[in-house]
Amino acid sequence: MSENTTHFGFRTVPEHEKANMVRAVFDSVAGKYDVMNDLMSIGIHRLWKRIAVDLAHVRSGEKVLDLAGGTGDLTALFRKRVGARGFVVLSDINAEMLRRGRDRIIDDGLAESVAYAQIDAEKLPFPHDSFDCISIGFGLRNVTHKDKALNSMYRALKPGGRLIVLEFSEVHNELLRKAYDLYSFKVLPFLGKLVANDAESYRYLAESIRMHPNQEKLKAMMEKAGFERCEYFDLMQGIVAVHRGYKF
């Protein structure tokens, strides 16, 4: 793959086109995003997110940046942990997803001490040492230059700050992997067509999971960006993994 191309699912595309293509996917699925998440995971995604927040060890009064925050699930959980004395930034590169997240936070009565930002994870517009914790949930696989994004996150974290990456990963059990592939490439697009009238976007999401670095590769990328004490926690045999790293 040349330096001017990247992957969009299983397709090879010009680097400069990927962000707009990803944006179009989430423009398409935004209206049914929460419904599809519940349906695709039988609601288990909510448990995964709670585990990720538990591993972040955020405390009252801390500042958190939730990247690719979408409809606000992680932001809501973080806001409850840091309280009104803390501060959470709900961010997403997609305006429609961010709008839905903002509406949800307001409806849940959590708007105090929450801000909103439409930003690119590769170019965070915050000063050095701004946040106690940065999270990115089910979003890093959609980033074109993951190394740039990790470097940007490292810069924006305070010394002692934590990075939490919640993402689909590599399944360890061979039998489960075969069943998961069948579900991902047959059932998932069917559900996307049935519920969201968009099979192609969910086919891309399945492909993007397979193209994402596995647990060890992502851990190495975090270490290369400067993070220390990097580790990961497999959930459901590696269908999902939570990576954690510290800036010291």
Curated annotation (Swiss-Prot):
Class in the EC hierarchy, top level: transferase
Keywords, comma-separated and alphabetical: Menaquinone biosynthesis, Methyltransferase, S-adenosyl-L-methionine, Transferase, Ubiquinone biosynthesis
Gene3D superfamilies: Vaccinia Virus protein VP39
UniProt KW rRNA-binding keyword: no
PROSITE patterns named among the record's database cross-references: SAM_MT_UBIE, UBIE_1
GO molecular function: 2-methoxy-6-polyprenyl-1,4-benzoquinol methyltransferase activity; demethylmenaquinone methyltransferase activity
Annotated catalysed reactions: a 2-demethylmenaquinol + S-adenosyl-L-methionine = a menaquinol + S-adenosyl-L-homocysteine + H(+); a 2-methoxy-6-(all-trans-polyprenyl)benzene-1,4-diol + S-adenosyl-L-methionine = a 5-methoxy-2-methyl-3-(all-trans-polyprenyl)benzene-1,4-diol + S-adenosyl-L-homocysteine + H(+)
Entries under InterPro entries matching the protein: SAM-dependent_MTases_sf, UbiE/COQ5_MeTrFase, UbiE/COQ5_MeTrFase_CS
This protein's record includes keyword Transferase: yes
Protein name: Ubiquinone/menaquinone biosynthesis C-methyltransferase UbiE
Native organism: Methylococcus capsulatus (strain ATCC 33009 / NCIMB 11132 / Bath)
